[in-house]
């Protein structure tokens, strides 16, 4: 009975399966399922080929660099920097990507390899910072670092036979002459490192004495040039005044550009009483004038036919006197020769005396003298060389 029921159930399942397949084929669902299954099988086969031929995630350049000693040292410094500041997330990426999960050196081994000595229990910062500091110190002052290493050995500095330090000593800030450095290296070997405290104390005094002597020589030469310039200018002024007494040449000289001091009392011509004659101590570097026409003292008297010629000469002399009076070429009793070299006029006011007036007076007295054609030429030259008398022959107040 059980066998018959099992056979009935099997027949029913077969009929149900056939009916289901026929229904799915008629609706197209079965064909679509078969196509999707075939596509999934092909995709699975393609993905399997890609996974097998896929290149591993390895950086060849980094791998070659880490195989060297310096490369592992750099990677260890970076890892120590991240560990010092507890950058755990960055370390989680750094180690897998560089394939350095194991094999990097610790802080103590790194400090020993780099020659960094740390006191126990004192950690100032990452080792990478100490490496950068040492590089900066070497760039700034290699000489000072070498001196510190020499002093750390505990050996006292040796001295040369002359007691002078070698070229490795600290340079002095006081300027020295070029020849001093050459004298300093005499009798020393190039490889010796010698210093001397006595030399460092004596060198500033020697350089100071040399600078003082140089400055004194410079000032002496400067004073000599000034004295020669002043003497040459005085000689040129005398020559120009003796050769060219007229006012046209005098006006071009900057010596007469100083303002003329106004006197309290002035004197002028008898024919032109309103015209003032200014005084100027411009002839202070010339000899004193004692007489206006001393050169005509013993000249022979003029003849009557030549009196007309003398009057013509008188007019010319008046014109010359007017030019001289307009320039104010007067002298006083006391002359200060130092005033010629001062830019500011510190000249004291002195009594004025017109040279042109004295020319007219002396000429009127000597009109009847002898032939003065040659004497009158000497007259213009004597005006700048001779000195006026202390007492004037004629004075007239100006209204």
Swiss-Prot record:
According to its UniProt entry, what is the function of this protein? Required for anchoring microtubules to the centrosomes. Required for ciliation.
Family of the protein in this entry: Belongs to the CEP43 family.
Q: Which residues carry this modification: Phosphoserine?
A: 152, 160, 202, 301, 326
Ranges of biased composition (kind: Acidic residues):
246-256
Q: Which residues carry this modification: Phosphotyrosine?
A: 337
> Which residue intervals are annotated with compositional bias (Basic and acidic residues) in the record?
259-275
InterPro entries listed in its UniProt record: FOP_dimerisation-dom_N (IPR018993), LisH (IPR006594)
Q: State where composition is biased (Basic residues).
A: 175-186
Q: What is the designated name of this protein?
A: Centrosomal protein 43
Main localization (coarse): cytoplasm
Bias (Low complexity) ranges: 197-216, 290-302
